[in-house]
Amino acid sequence: DKLLFFIYDPHGIPQLTEFVNRWQVLAQDNGLPPFYFIGNVTRSIEQEKGNALDAYALDLKNKAFNIEKNTVLRKGLSYLFPFPINVIRYSKAIDKMVDDILFRKSKIYPIIYPNWDHSPRAGNSASIMHGSTPQLWGKLLEKVISLIHDKDEGDQIIFIKSWNEWGEGNYLEPDLKYGRGYLDVMNKMLRKENVYNERGKW
């Protein structure tokens, strides 16, 4: 067994190899298992090969919004219009957030979103996934689970991004509109795949 160490911005660490090696030494010196380093990736996986990380979590949200393209134009338009312009229907976003080839590969883990709207923080420059529902969330889960189904058991990992501190409209918790809808759908999908142990826990 290893300790999971997730790095949100590997490129923000100038000496990544030294950083990883240092933490492995600290783990060994303190009688801990080695770390398993996973780096968050939003662009090409090919650019990451050869670095010190063990695996990658692939986040394709930017691809769904085409954020890498026309960035300057988008920023300029956000100042001109009194409303967010970077809006995509969740039903379309869930297709763009999935890579049928890469998500099947070993040591590449999907990152998926139940919803996204950080307009309370970003205002008119916000990115918004509009029209998310528990049913569409279930469709995304089912698709991604099917892609990792044939991986080795220890490699069947999905990261669900639900961090409403930074993206206020990015959450799984019960709300007034859908109640426990998102959690119930996820529970249903996981039980369907028999990912719970005999005690009913993850």
Language-model-derived ranges and their functions:
Residues 19, 93-97, 137-147, 182:
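Alpha-helical packing segments of well-folded alpha/beta enzyme cores
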Residues 13-35, 170-189:
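Surface-exposed flexible segments
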Residues 30, 96-108, 147-154, 189-196:
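A structural motif corresponding to the C-terminal end of an alpha-helix
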Residues 182-202:
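Carbohydrate-binding surfaces of carbohydrate-active enzymes
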Residues 1-13, 156-165:
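Active-site groove signature of glycoside hydrolases
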